[in-house]
Amino acid sequence: MPYSRDITKFITATEPEVGLPLLALQRSKSVIGIILLVISLLLIFIGIIILSVSSHTTAGSVLVVLSLILGGGGFFLIYKDNS
């Protein structure tokens, strides 16, 4: 039965129809994770500026908390790919 193989054989497969899509999926997860981290760092920076400059402390703190959650998701995607 060709579909009862171990998952490690799919990951290390040299067949283009099996190996390349998995490799592309793994790279895209890493790229998405890095993009999420960069966006979250920018949002944290903007949130800190909002907190320090203006009187919109609620909006700034919500922005910082949401960006920390977003960055945690990006870090999780990168960490999961590397483990």
Curated annotation (Swiss-Prot):
Any one GO cellular component localisation term in the record: virion membrane
Record key words, sorted: Late protein, Membrane, Transmembrane, Transmembrane helix, Virion
Similarity-based family: Belongs to the asfivirus EP84R family.
Keyword Transferase belongs to the record: no
Main location: virion
Domain of life from the UniProt record: Viruses
Name of this chain's protein: Transmembrane protein EP84R
Inducing factors: Expressed in the late phase of the viral replicative cycle.
Localization per record: Virion membrane
